[in-house]
């Protein structure tokens, strides 16, 4: 036993011993002077299509057109938001008045590269208010030769999606719950993080209701008692369809070559005009309040520890210097204290420079008290920070790489 204890102490001492500069200098590395001070930056062009805003990204895509149909969710009350992601999944699979789900799936497979949904919130740069724009996105990609077919399928979904196949809807709900249960065990940090950021901004509360713990718990209740809740759920799907599928709520985005973008602009007007007309009135959702300190129980033997705050009440306080500090926090401080010495599988920082919201996240972490002690000790560690010029250069290089990632055209657009 004494041998094991002594060996453990030796390993801890070795783990805490910093690597000497001579050893580090053996590694090949770039210099700051090797970096392009003005890396290429893609910026979308704003246009118009049938009276709706169109975001255009002209990029080489090898004959593939990426089309994104965004629907403004500002008119949705809070009670509908936990069903929004499930609604998006269902309408990308369920079929229409003229095509059952099997025929719809066959045509999607023949003429497109996929039809999917997502949700995001957008905050205007320099806006110090709590405002944000919540958008439900539907993503459709296809070869340029199948542009007409792909747009026809999208138009059918937005104009005549059918919820008549109750059995298929039940299957989708139960499948999504099974996947969500697995995700809670393997990627549970996202639920903890969404609860933390829900305390900090309106955008965080939207995300909590659509993709966070609130949405997951709602899905769990629905799946475990589906027979009793089915009628209410089907009415919610119809209500979401009627509120979202309106021309005035639509925002479009397209990525492709100049010729493909031109073809899209000429043909996509039929999709826009197929949506129901009518004004879209924004509402202020009545979100529930959450306790500042919470624990969400799962059957996993590891935990996900998240702690957050609003660092910059005024976004104007932010500048690029903080990105370098963030790199040190994530790749040096958290890596050494929470991962290497604490035994967590991972740890990182979540930060939004538009809202000033900041979070510390540990991933598959066997300890709680050690991790939160490391979080609480961070301000003191920053005040005492004294980096050599070589270490600072290394952090700048790492930050540059994070801000200038290699992206395919679809991601750039």
Predicted regions and their residues:
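Hydrophobic, Leu/Ile/Phe/Ala-enriched alpha-helical segments that form helix-helix packing faces
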Residues: 91, 108, 112, 158, ...
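Non-catalytic, conformational "gating/processing" segments within enzyme and secreted inhibitor domains
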Residues: 212, 233-268
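Generic intrinsically disordered, low-complexity segments enriched for polar/acidic and small residues
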Residues: 38, 203-206, 261
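Short linear interaction motifs
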Residues: 50, 228-236
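His/Glu-based metal-binding/catalytic segments typifying zinc-dependent metallopeptidases
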Residues: 1-92, 139, 249, 253, ...
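M16 family metallopeptidases and their MPP-like homologs
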Residues: 62-92, 99-228, 247-256, 304-324, ...
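Residues embedded in well-ordered secondary-structure elements
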Residues: 58, 127-129, 241, 296
């Amino acid at each position: 036993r004494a041998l094991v204890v002594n060996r453990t102490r030796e390993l801890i001492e070795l783990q805490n011993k910093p690597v000497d500069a001579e050893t580090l200098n053996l590694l090949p590395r770039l210099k700051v002077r090797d970096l392009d001070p003005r890396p290429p930056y893609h910026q979308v062009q704003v246009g118009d299509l049938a009276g709706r805003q169109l975001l255009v990204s002209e990029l080489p895509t090898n004959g593939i057109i990426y089309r994104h149909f965004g629907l403004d969710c500002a008119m949705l009350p809070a009670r509908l938001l936990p069903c929004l992601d499930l609604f998006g999944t269902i309408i990308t699979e369920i079929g229409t008045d003229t095509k059952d789900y099997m025929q719809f799936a066959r045509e999607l497979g023949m003429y497109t590269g996929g039809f999917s949904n997502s949700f995001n919130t957008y905050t205007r740069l320099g806006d110090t208010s709590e405002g944000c724009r919540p958008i439900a996105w539907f993503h459709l990609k296809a070869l340029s030769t199948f542009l007409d077919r792909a747009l026809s399928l999208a138009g059918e979904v937005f104009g005549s999606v059918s919820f008549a196949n109750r059995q298929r809807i039940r299957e989708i709900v139960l499948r999504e719950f099974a996947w969500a249960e697995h995700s809670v065990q393997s990627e549970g940090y996202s639920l903890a993080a969404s609860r933390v950021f829900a305390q900090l901004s309106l955008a965080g509360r939207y995300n909590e209701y659509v993709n966070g713990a609130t949405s997951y718990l709602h899905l769990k209740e629905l799946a475990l008692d589906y027979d009793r809740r089915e009628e209410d759920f089907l009415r919610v799907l119809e209500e979401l369809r009627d509120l979202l599928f309106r021309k005035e709520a639509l925002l479009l985005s397209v990525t492709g070559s100049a010729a493909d973008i031109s073809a899209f602009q000429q043909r996509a007007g039929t999709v826009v005009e197929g949506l129901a007309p009518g004004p879209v009135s924004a509402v202020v959702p009545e979100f529930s309040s959450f306790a500042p300190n919470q624990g969400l129980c799962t059957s996993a033997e590891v935990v996900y520890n998240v702690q957050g705050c609003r660092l910059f009440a005024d976004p104007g306080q932010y500048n690029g210097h903080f990105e370098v500090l963030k790199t040190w926090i994530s790749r040096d401080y958290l890596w050494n204290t929470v991962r290497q010495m604490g035994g967590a599988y991972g740890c990182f920082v979540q930060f939004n420079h538009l809202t000033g919201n900041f979070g510390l996240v540990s991933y598959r972490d066997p300890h709680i008290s050690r991790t939160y002690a490391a979080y609480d000790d961070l301000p003191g560690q920053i005040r005492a920070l004294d980096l050599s010029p070589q270490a600072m250069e290394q952090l700048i290089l790492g930050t540059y790489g994070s801000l200038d990632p290699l992206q395919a055209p679809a991601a750039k657009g």
